Amino acid sequence: MVSLKSLAAILVAMFLATGPTVLAQQCRDELSNVQVCAPLLLPGAVNPAANSNCCAALQATNKDCLCNALRAATTLTSLCNLPSFDCGISA
């Protein structure tokens, strides 16, 4: 029979192993919800006004997920062996 300490150790190991996967899935879901804001970000949008769906999605999005996605986007050029570029945005 498995001791209580062994069971606790197994549960902790399972949590640690699945933590990044769960966080990645959570971020993926939250970031996909922010797609309702895409029309506000497209070139040519004249005086875009945020709608309630965009604002609600943005408010519900984990800020770390959003910031990490933006940081990751800036590395895409190097991952694709393309020249880097600067959009004039500082974070």
Swiss-Prot record:
Its main location: secreted. Tapetum of anthers. Pfam families: LTP_2 (PF14368). InterPro entries: Bifun_inhib/LTP/seed_sf, Bifunc_inhib/LTP/seed_store. The keyword ATP-binding does not apply. The keyword Transferase does not apply. This is Tapetum-specific protein A9. It comes from Arabidopsis thaliana (Mouse-ear cress).
